Amino acid sequence: MSTIEERVKKIVAEQLGVKEEEVKNESSFVDDLGADSLDTVELVMALEEEFETEIPDEEAEKITTVQAAIDYVNAHQG
């Protein structure tokens, strides 16, 4: 079983069409990985599906980096 961090990075790479090794914890979806607003919405939806959770819009707006996504999932698992 892969870790939450590995799973988040894999989803980010798939959704944004970048190589997994380019996805760093500190990477900003928009500034570093080239995401636009639609990409970020689709990314949040993919995270919700993968981790079987619902991310409210006000929380989703705060998830702007890979680490923020990892932290959110870690805090809301279980």
Swiss-Prot record:
Residues 2-77 form the Carrier domain. The keyword Lipid biosynthesis applies. One of its GO terms (molecular function) is acyl carrier activity. Keywords: Cytoplasm, Fatty acid biosynthesis, Fatty acid metabolism, Lipid biosynthesis, Lipid metabolism, Phosphopantetheine, Phosphoprotein. GO terms for cellular component: cytosol; membrane. The keyword Phosphoprotein applies. 4'-phosphopantetheine is transferred from CoA to a specific serine of apo-ACP by AcpS. This modification is essential for activity because fatty acids are bound in thioester linkage to the sulfhydryl of the prosthetic group. The modification O-(pantetheine 4'-phosphoryl)serine is found at S37. Pathway: Lipid metabolism; fatty acid biosynthesis. It is found in: Cytoplasm. GO terms for biological process: lipid A biosynthetic process. Its main location: cytoplasm. InterPro entries: ACP, ACP-like_sf, PP-bd_ACP, Ppantetheine_attach_site. Belongs to the acyl carrier protein (ACP) family. Carrier of the growing fatty acid chain in fatty acid biosynthesis. This is Acyl carrier protein. It comes from Pseudomonas entomophila (strain L48).
